Swiss-Prot record:
GO terms for cellular component: early endosome; endoplasmic reticulum membrane; Golgi apparatus; plasma membrane; recycling endosome; synaptic vesicle. Residues 54-57, 124-125 are extracellular. This is Calcium channel flower homolog. Belongs to the calcium channel flower family. It is found in: Cell membrane; Cytoplasmic vesicle, Secretory vesicle, Synaptic vesicle; Golgi apparatus; Vesicle. The chain crosses the membrane at residues 33-53, 58-78, 103-123, 126-142.
Length: 172
C-alpha cells in the first residue's frame, strides 16, 4: 500500500525528463504502442519457439517470453498489475534517457537471435528491436532540414573567404 501512496510524487518527478528530451506526445505513444506490440510478438513467437526438442530454440523461446514480460512491465505496467512493484519499475524506466532505453531494448531483442538464428526469433524480435530503434531516434532529437544546413554552410564559407581575402590584403 505504501508504494501506491508514493506513486504520484514519483510520477511527477519522472515526467520532466521525458519532456526535456523533446519527445512529442504522439511519438511517446508510438514508442509505447511499439513496445506493447513487440511484447505480444515476442510472447507468441517465444511460445511457438519452445515447441521443439532443440535446446537452443527452447532457450531462445524462454528468453523471448522474458523479453515480452519486461517490455510489458516497462511500457504498459497496467498489464502487469498482479505484480506489486510494476508501477515502481515503470517509473524508474521512464526516468531513463532515450538512448539508455534504446540500448536496453535492442540488446534484449538481439540475445535470442544470437542464441538461435531462426525465422521465428527474427520475426518475433523485430518489433521489440524496432522499439529500441524508435527510442534511439528520439535520443538523436530533431535535426535541421537540408536547406537550413546549406545556408549555414554557405555563411561559413563566405566568412572564411572574407578572412582569407583580408589576410591576403594584409600581406600585400
Amino acid at each position: 500500500m505504501s508504494s501506491s501512496g508514493g506513486a504520484p510524487g514519483a510520477s511527477a518527478s519522472s515526467a520532466p525528463p521525458a519532456q526535456e528530451e523533446g519527445m512529442t506526445w504522439w511519438y511517446r505513444w508510438l514508442c509505447r504502442l511499439s513496445g506493447v506490440l513487440g511484447a505480444v510478438s515476442c510472447a507468441i513467437s517465444g511460445l511457438f519457439n519452445c515447441i521443439t526438442i532443440h535446446p537452443l530454440n527452447i532457450a531462445a523461446g524462454v528468453w523471448m517470453i522474458m523479453n515480452a514480460f519486461i517490455l510489458l512491465l516497462c511500457e504498459a505496467p497496467f498489464c502487469c498489475q498482479f505484480i506489486e512493484f510494476a508501477n515502481t519499475v515503470a517509473e524508474k524506466v521512464d526516468r531513463l534517457r532515450s538512448w539508455q532505453k534504446a540500448v536496453f531494448y535492442c540488446g534484449m531483442a538481439v540475445v535470442p537471435i544470437v542464441i538461435s538464428l531462426t525465422l521465428t526469433t527474427l520475426l518475433g524480435n523485430a518489433i521489440a528491436f524496432a522499439t529500441g530503434v524508435l527510442y534511439g531516434l528520439s535520443a538523436l532529437g530533431k535535426k535541421g532540414d537540408a536547406i537550413s544546413y546549406a545556408r549555414i554552410q554557405q555563411q561559413r564559407q563566405q566568412a572564411d573567404e572574407e578572412k582569407l581575402a583580408e589576410t591576403l590584403e594584409g600581406e600585400l
